[in-house]
Amino acid sequence: MALLTNYWMCLVTLSSTVTMGHALRRITLKKMPSIRETLWEMGVSAEQVLTELSQKSPSDNNNGTVPTPLTNYLDTQYFGEISIGSPAQMFNVVFDTGSANLWIPSQSCSPFSTACFTHNRYDASKSWTYVENGTGFSIQYASGNVRGFLSEDVVVVGGIPVVQVFAEATSLSAMPFIFAKFDGVLGMGYPNSAIDGITPVFDRIMSQHVLKEEVFSVYYSRDPKHSPGGELVLGGTDPNYYTGNFNYMNTKEMGKWEVTMKGVSVGTEMMFCAEGCTAVIDTGSSYITGPASAVSVLMKTIGAQLDESGYKVNCDTVKTLPSVTFYLGGQEYSLTQEDYILWQSQIEGDVCTVTFRGLDVPPPTGPIWILGANFIARFYTEFDRRNNRIGFATAV
């Protein structure tokens, strides 16, 4: 009886929003220091942390566990706010096109999981729309793991409420999640990427027919002093965020936000991917990632040196650095040095970090390139679920 009552209340809540029409729904995105930047300021190497994690963490073969080697939240900087439960409990989440599940820390978190206690935690006992599930949940990332159990409640994103199955995390890797500015992750990927066959949040939203179009778009401000840091738009795009027209590419494989790339050039020289390769468009990543050997050559070309926190260049040389161009759908998408250099002022002087990372993904998934937030900041990006395509337009 209690279960039916909960569902009835959910339906009443949902029905009250149907009359709002097909307006664009907006989620403000905040930009905060990444885990890597936080560790660096503490004098800790993120790479050393990952090495220690890989040595200490045993392989996990439990039911429901899906390795996600492409997802690395060390450099994630953008997140937005959602609510779960009735009354609303607020959480800051990464909207990640590289995954499809929603997870947030649980009030039932293990006392040994220190990362849980530095974040907002969902308390099922305080929500009258909570429905128990209890199925175990586990996901392994390149930078840590998340374990817990499934629950169901009302989730509100951009003013749109949906009845959603999500994961309550009872155990989070202390490194690196204890330093994360976000509470959890909301996957914007396709259903076939979801663990345990859970219907993703955006699919639940689409099923309500409250959006004008079955798309979402992501804008990241390139101005470090600009607040907010960006916006996730559900149902369409905002012409205030771009100039010219969108150029579209069909997704390479049904169910994944990835496309075929036809080359990467540095300056005027075609250097990588001339025979074609896969490019993943990933809002969960802040940097651009490519095969380690290719990124190493690229860094040598621009005179970058690798240290414990990434590739660096002499700040005096930044203005002379070449553009890096990606060839997608017959179009050229060029990043200037202003787009791929992160300029940070420190007490001891300015530091210029190159926002590229090397990552070898084995076949059949790899090798791949991952175009993250520094690419999306330059090219406003539309993710079109109805037509299974991705569009790019020059961001303002």
Cite the ranges covered by each PLM segment.
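Zymogen propeptides
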Residues: A2-V165, A174-M175, A194, N240-K256, ...
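Structural signal for hydrophobic/aromatic residues that build the beta-strand cores
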Residues: I82, V93-D96, V155, G187, ...
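Active-site beta-strand/loop microenvironment that shapes enzyme catalytic pockets
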Residues: M90-P105, F272-T301
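Charged, amphipathic alpha-helical segments
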Residues: N133-S138, I198-S207, G303-N314
